Amino acid sequence: MLVAAVFSNAENARKIADSLARYGIRAIAAASGSAVLRQMQAVTLVVCGARLEDMTAPRLRRMLPAEIPMLLLAPGAPQLAGIENLPAGLTRAQLCEIVLHHIGAQEALVARAKRAMIRRGGVDEAAAHRLLQKHAMNSGVSLRRAAEEILQKYGEDESI
């Protein structure tokens, strides 16, 4: 799981990435949306400001796969589809808790897909994980999307 902290001010991006790292969250800092797009396969969540070095948050949202959540740290910004606006006055600790919640939901989805593969595919946990990663890479989708596809394949997608 990799979180991208993307802000036009590179120092702010670094501070947020460092805060996330202190909570045990793998994070990268970037000032541009294009930097995130280059690492799109690895990124599982984006935390960003309204304006980035080379584009706006809504433009980045349109370029990212729908299954990659975007959290917007821009109090007063209009609510847009696919972007979760975070409230004003959020502390770094509160931001980290929100990110952990999102990551936990994704990890639960991946775990469900692995359990389905173990039950129906006759593989062990390590093999299920490798197969899930391979499916994501071969399909060019995120691990979350690959897990959703596996659950759909096995008819266990009712809560997606």
Describe the residue ranges of each PLM region.
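Receiver (REC) domain switch/output surface
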Residues: 19, 86-105
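Conserved acidic segment of CheY-like receiver
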Residues: 1-10, 16-20, 46
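Alpha4 helix (beta4-alpha4-beta5 surface) of REC/receiver domains from two-component response regulators
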Residues: 75-85
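Short hydrophobic/Thr-rich beta-strand motif most characteristic of the beta2 strand and flanking loop
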Residues: 25-31
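Conserved phosphotransfer microenvironments
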Residues: 13, 33-37, 42-68
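A short, hydrophobic beta-strand element within the central beta-sheet of small alpha/beta folds
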Residues: 67-76
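Two-component signal transduction core modules
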Residues: 46, 85-86
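C-terminal output/effector regions of signal-responsive regulators
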Residues: 106-160
